[in-house]
Regions:
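C-terminal "cap" of GNAT-fold acetyltransferases
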Residues: 151, 158-162, 169-171, 180-200
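Conserved GNAT-fold acetyl-CoA-binding loop/helix
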Residues: 47-69
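Conserved N-terminal entry element of GNAT/NAT acetyltransferase domains
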Residues: 7-37, 199-200
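Conserved acyl-donor/pantetheine-binding loop and adjacent beta-alpha core of acyl/acetyltransferases
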Residues: 93-121, 129, 184-185
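Residue-level recognition of the GNAT/N-acetyltransferase active site
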Residues: 120, 125, 158
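A short helix-loop-beta-strand connector motif used in the catalytic cores of GNAT acetyltransferases and
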Residues: 68-81, 97-101, 118
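Conserved acetyl-CoA-binding loop-helix of GNAT-fold acetyltransferases
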Residues: 124, 130-143, 166-170
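Conserved beta-hairpin
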Residues: 78-92
Length: 200
């Protein structure tokens, strides 16, 4: 029994050590229009890897996300690749203000639209999931927002995306409520809205 406990402790410590190593080597890189093909290929690679991603995320090729979505973020300097050393392992959009649908949520932090950063389309390739990469990406997003003097980081997760909800809550994001939204890819669907307060 003691040997089993010692082994479990060792494996847990080793996993934590490996996750910290990933966090140390992970960074965000802003992209340009010339990177659009690479961005698209990343998201399609995720969706093609398993039907579960389309079901959980409710993403549909060329409906959402599509080139117009990515371009709108890229031209405003809000689209990023997630890099581990030199390897591209994911992507994310971090906007410099919130959109109108966020105005109906009862947020904990009092802030104008331009005083918050909003996370969209966060994705990590399947082979890097489960090893701390998503948490490390959130670390970098929080740093990015803090450097821009934002008061909070906000995001939403579709109700079917339970893994993301667990990730955000474990990280420290506060559940600020739900709202029904209509999108072409999802229809009328409930979303959960989260907020992470930044120290002033």
């Amino acid at each position: 029994m003691e040997r089993t406990r010692a082994l479990e402790c060792f494996l847990s410590e080793r996993q934590e050590s490996e996750e910290k190593a990933i966090m140390k080597n992970l960074r965000l890189k802003e992209v340009s229009i010339k990177d659009l093909d690479q961005i698209r290929a990343l998201y399609w690679r995720l969706l093609d890897s398993s039907p579960k991603y389309g079901q959980i995320l409710q993403w549909k090729k060329n409906i959402y996300p599509n080139d117009d979505d990515w371009n709108s973020y890229i031209v405003k300097g809000e689209m990023y690749l997630i890099l581990k050393d030199v390897d591209v392992i994911g992507a994310v959009a971090v906007t410099n203000a919130q959109s109108k649908e966020y105005g109906k949520i009862q947020w904990k932090v009092k802030a104008d639209d331009q005083d918050v950063a909003v996370v969209h389309l966060l994705m990590v390739l399947p082979e890097y999931q489960g090893d701390g990469a998503a948490t490390a990406a959130l670390d970098e997003i929080i740093k990015l927002a803090a450097d821009k003097k934002k008061k909070a980081v906000r995001l939403d997760a579709i109700e079917t995306n339970v893994p993301a909800q667990k990730l955000y809550e474990k990280y420290g994001f506060v559940n600020c409520g739900t709202a029904q939204e209509y999108y072409e890819s999802t229809g009328e669907t409930e979303f959960v809205f989260y907020e992470y307060a930044l120290a002033e």
